[in-house]
Amino acid sequence: MWDLNDSPAAEAAPPPLSPSADDSGASSSSAAAVVEIPDDADDDSAAVVVVTRQFFPPAVPGGGGDPAPGNARAGWLRLAGAAPPVAATGPAASAAVSKKSRRGPRSRSSQYRGVTFYRRTGRWESHIWDCGKQVYLGGFDTAHAAARAYDRAAIKFRGVEADINFSLEDYEDDLKQMSNLTKEEFVHVLRRQSTGFPRGSSKYRGVTLHKCGRWEARMGQFLGKKYVYLGLFDTEEEAARAYDRAAIKCNGKDAVTNFDPSIYAGEFEPPAAATGDAAEHNLDLSLGSSAGSKRGNVDGGGDDEITGGGGGGAGSDQRVPMAFDLDWQTAAARSTKAKFDQNSNHPQMPPVLQVTHLPFSPRHHHQFLSNGDPGTAGGLSLTIGAGMAGHWPPQQQQGWGNAGGMSWPHPPHPPPPPTNAAAAATATAAAASSRFPPYIATQASTWLQKNGFHSLTRPT
């Protein structure tokens, strides 16, 4: 085994490195330690010299950019004849950095945005995308006209910040028109101005070239119809004005017209004479309604005059009605339940032969009696049945003989009741004329007199 402690030749340990070399090696990887040994020295007495060289010195604190110029860097690397690099400055640098545009790809067949040339039709057509759908704006003869149509639609759809082909100042006049129209209406305006609109179209709203050579004015989608025909005219302007008048009449001041609505202001103001006639017509209507209401009040107040006990009102009404009220069925239907309850409290009597089923009220009876002939009213013969008595209130039946201290004129003594044979003949004749089966009811002749009813018959 080797004796390491008693080694005869102990090699001298190399001297430690300088602290600067240790620090530089730990701090940066660009530093290197180089050992230089002179050639003329003896092997035994040779001194080892360690030199540290920094190839890339650290940056100066607080300074920006390179710490030394380009020739100093060449000196570090000991490179001869290396030219210093030149930094790119000036407008060329700004041009190199391009701004990302919001615009999409341009048309492949046109230099304008939103314009495409179709060889089949030979026209330049304009389109715009809205909500994921392509909206057709029309076909034009030139690409410039199609581009202007696209610009107007883009401003309407996306505002003044939209990407357009020309300057925004060129469309200042169109901005006013855009504010009054919706998207759909503005698209229709652009299509009418295009040359690719269907045959017979016009640049005016509601105007179409008829096959006879004249211009037809019409309104579309009015009152559920497809269109309303307004007439044929010699020129487009006349047809457009006819459409404007019709639109103003239907939609008022908010109507969309071809020309300025102010030029039609004088046509829709009614003249003074027409206003006077309308006032007289309204006066006649008001008088007619007041007369009708007065008549209704008089008819409705007849019962009050008879039963109220006022005195003079009942005797002053000398009018003879020409016909009974025609709405008696409606009035009777409304009070059917009340009359049924009232009739249930009175004994039911078999009715006498009734020729007519018209309603009869005390005021009508008074009118018949006041005509002078108690048995006849305008040549009309009536037979009052017992069934009618149940429809009158009891207070009217009791107070009919003396209302308000006045005595009613009593008709002359009624003729004796007809015999059974005469009644049967009358019933048969009445049934034959009215197409109803005959019905004869017999009862005591004194019952009518006890209840205050008298038969009205035509005198022979």
Curated annotation (Swiss-Prot):
GO terms for cellular component: nucleus; transcription regulator complex. Transcription factor. Involved in spikelet transition and development. Prevents lemma and palea elongation as well as grain growth. Required for seed shattering through specifying abscission zone (AZ) development. Induction: Target of miR172 microRNA mediated cleavage, particularly during floral organ development. Induced by SH5 in spikelets abscission zones (AZ). Triggered by cold stress. InterPro entries: AP2/ERF_dom, AP2/ERF_dom_sf, DNA-bd_dom_sf. It comes from Oryza sativa subsp. japonica (Rice). Residues 409-419 have a biased composition (Pro residues). Residues 1-39, 87-111, 284-319, 398-429 are annotated as: Disordered. Keywords: DNA-binding, Nucleus, Repeat, Transcription, Transcription regulation. PANTHER family: AP2-LIKE ETHYLENE-RESPONSIVE TRANSCRIPTION FACTOR, FLORAL HOMEOTIC PROTEIN APETALA 2. GO terms for molecular function: DNA-binding transcription factor activity; transcription cis-regulatory region binding. It is found in: Nucleus. GO terms for biological process: regulation of floral organ abscission; regulation of flower development; regulation of seed development; response to cold; seed abscission. Residues 111-167, 203-260 bind DNA. Signal peptide: none annotated. Its main location: nucleus. A motif (EAR) lies at residues 283-287. Disruption phenotype: Several spikelet and inflorescence developmental defects, including altered florets palea and lemma structures, abnormal numbers, size, appearance, and identities of floral organs, reduced primary branches number, and longer and fewer grains associated with a loss of grain shattering. Crook-neck-like rachilla between the sterile lemmas and the rudimentary glumes in place of the spikelet abscission zone (AZ). This is APETALA2-like protein 5. May form homodimer.
